[in-house]
Amino acid sequence: MAIQHPDIQPAVNHSVQVAIAGAGPVGLMMANYLGQMGIDVLVVEKLDKLIDYPRAIGIDDEALRTMQSVGLVDDVLPHTTPWHAMRFLTPKGRCFADIQPMTDEFGWPRRNAFIQPQVDAVMLEGVSRFPNVRCLFSRELEAFSQQDDEVTLHLKTAEGQREIVKAQWLVACDGGASFVRRTLNVPFEGKTAPNQWIVVDIANDPLSTPHIYLCCDPVRPYVSAALPHAVRRFEFMVMPGETEEQLREPQNMRKLLSKVLPNPDNVELIRQRVYTHNARLAQRFRIDRVLLAGDAAHIMPVWQGQGYNSGMRDAFNLAWKLALVIQGKARDALLDTYQQERRDHAKAMIDLSVTAGNVLAPPKRWQGTLRDGVSWLLNYLPPVKRYFLEMRFKPMPQYYGGALMREGEAKHSPVGKMFIQPKVTLENGDVTLLDNAIGANFAVIGWGCNPLWGMSDEQIQQWRALGTRFIQVVPEVQIHTAQDNHDGVLRVGDTQGRLRSWFAQHNASLVVMRPDRFVAATAIPQTLGKTLNKLASVMTLTRPDADVSVEKVA
């Protein structure tokens, strides 16, 4: 299935605010977010079209929330299978670890299968909404140089024509073999797994059982995954001495599939590819006016499906900060918080993915025996079993420093964590997810109180200039009490009672939420003004030049 790029007339000497190297998922998400912020963006891709073979197969709740932030989630959902469980099986087929979280604190199912090329196509189509975003395919980045106030890119087209791009910033989303990262001599430390895996995708799923199974077979570990649109993926470890060419031969492919299918001859093969699993992390994510994101910054084994999702976290974290800097609303020191916040969590996800791979295919035979023995204990330790079932082992992003203002003990503070996204009731009676009411920018959310009460006129002006939405949350039965309305404040009803529980748990009545839905600060009305001043300083926010009109929200 070839996904052709839009018919774009080539031009020479492009001048933009942001150049993005790579039209993969991270580059396209960056382009969509920056596009809706009004930033002038150019995406350059060396291939002539999007990659059309499946790679990632797992998209989580945080990534779907990111899709929601750019208005694409409704187009993405048809290419997903929600509530997709992951089950580890012993060689005899006994399930010893069942990862099946049923929580939706961020508004979406926590684990989902998906077809990456179709979702990438949604994002490519998404950028066409913005006249300020252009995508140029068949453009190889041959060289680039940094100046004090810009980056110069030298491109070559498929016909050999040279083009020059001038950009204020360059975001490298050009994959694990990133030309940008290598040119800058940024160390990419880590390991490459000794064994490769062959991935086989089959149409008209011959099994059609739901979920994904990781079979810990000591002879040849394998994976069986149900994907949307009746696609079945099998992954088999390539054993020492085997080559991709050998495994592609019909008799050898038949032998592989006979492990998992009663009739390996009656299948509709889509493709087979051999992959090497790497675990590597760039030493730096920002080098002056160049920023690394996605696989250019970190790569990890596939076993927890977090490579794609980590890239989405990068895009969401970086895009809003870059937009503020370009718009003159923050100084470029804000961009230093991108590495400060994202690098440690990316490392944690790499470590988790490596551990999951070692459970599936232990490096030593005795480790597999130990795994099988320990797995029996899970049946007799319900708390431990729930720990896996509810996916509590997944390191949730929590930032201890960066673009946030924390006071008190970090361990129990909600600051630096993603804010929940329950359903809320609007004053017209509509019920929607919280982010839909907030929009794409900052929000100051108050439980029961007028969030403007503790702010000075100057502070209101400063935060309105950022597009901040001021939200008053009330019990749903109070949503139509007109006397509680305040100019410039959106009132929402707590449809599910989750917001009341959140504020009660964290002993706060106000939360400052960043555009990437992370909690930047908490306060009570009497401390909000002081907290916002400290937060503005930490984020290096600038003062608005002109008054911002007060919005009346009905």
Swiss-Prot record:
GO BP terms in the entry: 3-(3-hydroxy)phenylpropionate catabolic process; 3-phenylpropionate catabolic process
Record family assignment: Belongs to the PheA/TfdB FAD monooxygenase family.
Catalysed transformations (reactions): 3-(3-hydroxyphenyl)propanoate + NADH + O2 + H(+) = 3-(2,3-dihydroxyphenyl)propanoate + NAD(+) + H2O; (2E)-3-(3-hydroxyphenyl)prop-2-enoate + NADH + O2 + H(+) = (2E)-3-(2,3-dihydroxyphenyl)prop-2-enoate + NAD(+) + H2O
InterPro entries: 3-HPP/3HCI_hydroxylase, FAD-bd, FAD/NAD-bd_sf, PheA/TfdB_FAD_monoxygenase
Protein name: 3-(3-hydroxy-phenyl)propionate/3-hydroxycinnamic acid hydroxylase
Alphabetical keyword list: Aromatic hydrocarbons catabolism, FAD, Flavoprotein, NAD, Oxidoreductase
HAMAP family with a match to the protein in the record: MhpA (MF_01652)
